């Protein structure tokens, strides 16, 4: 099974937040990927906290999470998910993660409880870390 990490899951791990143990276990034992859109989200949050952007790439390599470039197929699917996720306020980054999970037939991993309200509608299995 492949796991697709949302920015919230990676941030929880990197910052020792609740749910970090769940993410750590997945990364140690399973194949994990992350959309380049979600990498940008994580990087933005970490830069806001003073981390150098170059450190993000090193950290992802150390975590053994494979980055996946956001391509036209993902972008099109991401846009199509807008209608079924708008009512719970999912962002572009959220939908990018869900789109990638749908395409790779993986499980999306997040700390955002709103995702459980749309998982069935977008045909993606969602694992809540908290």
For the regions a protein language model found, what residue spans apply to each?
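Short active-site oxyanion
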Residues: 1, 29-32, 64-66, 102-107
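Short, well-structured N-terminal submotif of metal-dependent ribonuclease cores
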Residues: 1-34, 46-58
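Alpha-helix capping/helix-boundary segments
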Residues: 9-10, 38, 74, 96-97, ...
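Conserved SAM-binding loop
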Residues: 12, 67, 90, 108
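A general structural signal for well-ordered alpha-helical segments in protein cores
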Residues: 20, 39, 53, 75-78
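Acidic catalytic patch
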Residues: 64-86
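Acidic, PIN/NYN-like endoribonuclease modules and their adjacent C-terminal/linker elements
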Residues: 98, 102-130
């Amino acid at each position: 099974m492949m796991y697709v990490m949302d920015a919230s899951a990676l941030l929880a791990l990197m910052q020792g937040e609740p749910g970090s143990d769940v993410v750590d276990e997945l990364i140690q034992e399973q194949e994990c990927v992350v959309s380049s859109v979600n990498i940008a989200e994580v990087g933005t949050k970490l830069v806001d906290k003073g981390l150098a952007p170059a450190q993000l790439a090193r950290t992802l390599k150390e975590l053994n999470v494979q980055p996946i470039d956001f391509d036209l197929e993902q972008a099109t699917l991401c846009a199509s998910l807008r209608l079924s996720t708008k009512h719970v306020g999912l962002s572009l980054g959220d939908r990018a993660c869900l789109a990638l999970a749908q395409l790779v037939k993986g499980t999306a991993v997040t700390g955002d409880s709103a995702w459980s309200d749309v998982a069935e509608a977008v045909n993606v299995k969602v694992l809540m870390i908290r």
